[in-house]
Amino acid sequence: MVDKVKSDLTVGSIPGHFYRLAIPMAIGMVFYTLYNMAGIYFAGKLSTNAQAGIGIGHLVYFFLIAFGFGLNAAMAGLVGNALGERKINEAKLLITKGISLAVVISIILMVFGIICGPLVINLVSEVGSYREYSVRYFLILLSALPAFLISYTCNGALQAQGDSVSMQRALIGAFFLIIIITPILIFGVPNLWLGIGFDGISLSVVICQNLVMVFLLIQVKRSALGLHLTWKVSLTNFRGNYEIIKQMIPGCMSFQMVIIGSLVVQFALKGFGPNALAGYNIGLRIEQLLLLPILGMTQALLPIVAQNYGAKNFQRVRLALYYCCSAGFVTMIIVYPIIWVFGSSVLKVFTPSSEVISVGVSYLRIDGLILPLYAILFSINSFLQGVKRPASIFWIGLFRQGLLNAFFIWIFIGVLGCDVWGVWVGAGVSVFFGWMLSIFIAYKVANKEIGGLWQKSQI
């Protein structure tokens, strides 16, 4: 049965596996980022306040869908480990339990979001129309939570089998659909329908995400491991649930630390007005697009590490980590001149406001300096998830995003009285110290789990 799985990552060329897995993942994430940027673009056709509102509402929503990313990583790691150990029935059971768990978690999160989401938005925003836009955007998006969590649970199961193409196809389709239906929902059809205005942005996301979920469920059903959903399996074997939750929570919380870090930035920027918030949110989307090469590589690293760790091929784990870190580091060095030269031109696509563009350019040029550090941070996160040490990811995130981010931004803004650029510098300094901690933790974990990082060999 294992031979029918899309790819056995315990044999063959490591760079070849990266090439085959990372490119579809990166392409998929390009369209996922463009999918998210579509909302910012169409909001810009309404007002700067609408853009600022979407930025804040999406961040709070992202805090909840971090559970989806946690489930994705947990499924990729656990199913990949099971396949590496040739435990096919266990891998099948994990997929069933993961999807069932995604349904339960999403219902709980929807209730939590309705109660707490508007309170968080009020905390990081000032009274005004952009706060109202944030709350409206967030509350409608909550109805897409089940689809999002199930989609990424399915994606983790497919990634573990070496399938990175299904999510790519789903996201490409979702992007083209969203750019068609969003303007129709916002502005309507001349002489036929007036549209629903701003709320059409979030409603289009709900529609597209549910279609992505249906497609990925079909792909899991068609995969070698299949989909075996029954009430009996879904409601029993709590050990399976425990293993998934144990792997999910630290990864989820590490994503949430990223959101907390962004909310800290939003909180610091609210005193500079909606133009600063809009500039940051547009700049952040552009930066996410530039990070996609290393995000594709680091997502590919997870199933490679997971399968080889499960098969006790520790030297291949080391080689995969080295390859991902070095290739990502060099790629981000190449990307920075692109930011410097073309950043302003890209921002003009989203807004005509010179103040918004100025803020966005300053963010991209300062934060762009630390992009190579992100390559190593993300690589280490995938390595830790693959060797079943996701709790370490949380501690790195808490230290970097939760503590140092707030501390250094306060130093530059509150103590030194810097302008908006002080927020970017403070966040950058926190990334540097988080990078140092991640290297230290990776070294310690590698010594315990795979016999160290520094054994010599050739890829």
Predicted regions and their residues:
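Small-residue hotspots at the loop-to-helix junctions and early N-terminal turns
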Residues: T48-L59, F138, S202, P274-L289, ...
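Transmembrane alpha-helix boundary and packing residues in multipass membrane permease domains
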Residues: M25, M29, I40-Y41, G77, ...
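Short alpha-helical transmembrane segments in multi-pass integral membrane proteins
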Residues: M1-A22, V79-P146, G188-I249, V305-I370, ...
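Small-residue-rich hydrophobic transmembrane alpha-helices
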Residues: Q51-I115, F148-M167, Y280-G343, Y374-I396
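Transmembrane helical elements of multi-pass membrane transporters/channels
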Residues: R20-G39, I140, S151, A174, ...
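Helix-terminus/linker motif at the lipid-water interface of multi-pass membrane proteins
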Residues: V30, L34-A52, I121-G128, I184-G195, ...
